[in-house]
């Protein structure tokens, strides 16, 4: 299977998933984890319509007094993002691709120990992440070098036996995949 075929299969499967319910279950799983409770800073993607909903995660991070950073896509076609700290969900406005993006202060790097929550279209049991194909999160993870825990948020139905990979794909390891049923 090619990456293009895998993306098509993942997108087709997603259409039949209740992503709101899956997002709510993932959120409850996340809040029970020591990595969440211990994190002073959380980096989290702002979900699109076809992703598990991260709104409750963003809200709880703010209510809990955690420093919250979200990505902002940079202009151009080179798949770069920057980190932006927000202090309210009102700091989010529609940006590139119609994704809510922050209008807050850009920061240079995540502090050591920050928890990073990363999206995907699918993942395999070995931790190979399949994204949308632009390389935004592979570049992000390489550029910012994650020194704290990272979790890939993926519906259980999209954990495949195997996926194609390239040398630039940043792998995840067992224990770094969070589904609605817990950590894999």
Which residue stretches match the model-derived regions?
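Surface-exposed, charge/polar-rich loops and edge strands
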Residues: 1-5, 12-15, 111-116, 124-128, ...
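Short glycine-rich anion-binding loops that position phosphate/pyrophosphate groups of nucleotides
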Residues: 48-50, 121-125
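N-terminal active-site beta-alpha-beta segment that forms phosphate/nucleotide-binding
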Residues: 1-111
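Glycine-rich, N-terminal phosphate-binding loop of Rossmann-like dinucleotide-binding domains
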Residues: 46, 120, 179
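Mid-sequence acidic-hydrophobic segments that form the walls
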Residues: 102-105, 119, 143
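Receiver (REC) domain switch-region micro-motif
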Residues: 42, 116-117
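Short, well-ordered strand-loop elements centered on a beta-strand within folded domains, enriched
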Residues: 78-85, 128-130, 181-184
């Amino acid at each position: 299977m090619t990456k293009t075929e895998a993306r098509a299969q993942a997108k087709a499967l997603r259409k039949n998933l209740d992503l709101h319910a899956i997002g709510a279950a993932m959120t409850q799983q996340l809040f029970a984890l020591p990595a969440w409770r211990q994190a002073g800073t959380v980096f989290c993607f702002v979900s699109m319509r076809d992703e598990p909903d991260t709104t409750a995660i963003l809200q709880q991070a703010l209510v809990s007094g955690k420093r919250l950073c979200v990505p902002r896509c940079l202009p151009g076609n080179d798949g770069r993002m920057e980190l932006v700290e927000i202090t309210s969900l009102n700091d989010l406005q529609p940006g590139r691709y119609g994704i809510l993006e922050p209008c807050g202060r850009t920061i240079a790097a995540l502090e050591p120990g920050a928890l990073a929550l990363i999206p995907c279209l699918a993942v395999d049991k070995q931790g190979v992440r399949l994204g949308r194909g632009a390389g935004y999160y592979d570049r992000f993870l390489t550029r910012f070098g994650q020194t704290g825990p990272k979790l890939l948020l993926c519906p259980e139905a999209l954990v495949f036996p195997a996926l194609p990979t390239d040398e630039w794909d940043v792998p995840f390891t067992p224990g770094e995949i969070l589904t609605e049923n817990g950590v894999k």
